[in-house]
Amino acid sequence: GIMDTLKNLAKTAGKGALQSLLNKASCKLSGQC
C-alpha cells in the first residue's frame, strides 16, 4: 500500500543520509576532503 511505499522511501532516504554523513566524517578523519 501507500504506507509501505512511504516507509520504504523513508528508509532509503535515511540510508542515503547516513551514508553521506559517514563519508564526510571518514574523509575528514583521514584528511582527504
Swiss-Prot record:
Subcellular location: Secreted
Segments crossing the lipid bilayer: none
Keyword field contains Disulfide bond: yes
Record key words, sorted: Amphibian defense peptide, Antibiotic, Antimicrobial, Cytolysis, Disulfide bond, Hemolysis, Secreted
Disulfides per UniProt: C27-C33
A Gene Ontology biological process term: killing of cells of another organism
Record-level GO cellular component terms: extracellular region
Pfam families, A to Z: Antimicrobial_2
Tissue specificity field: Expressed by the skin glands.
Function noted in UniProt: Shows antibacterial activity against representative Gram-negative and Gram-positive bacterial species, and hemolytic activity.
Family: Belongs to the frog skin active peptide (FSAP) family. Brevinin subfamily.
Full protein name: Brevinin-2E
Organism name: Pelophylax lessonae (Pool frog)
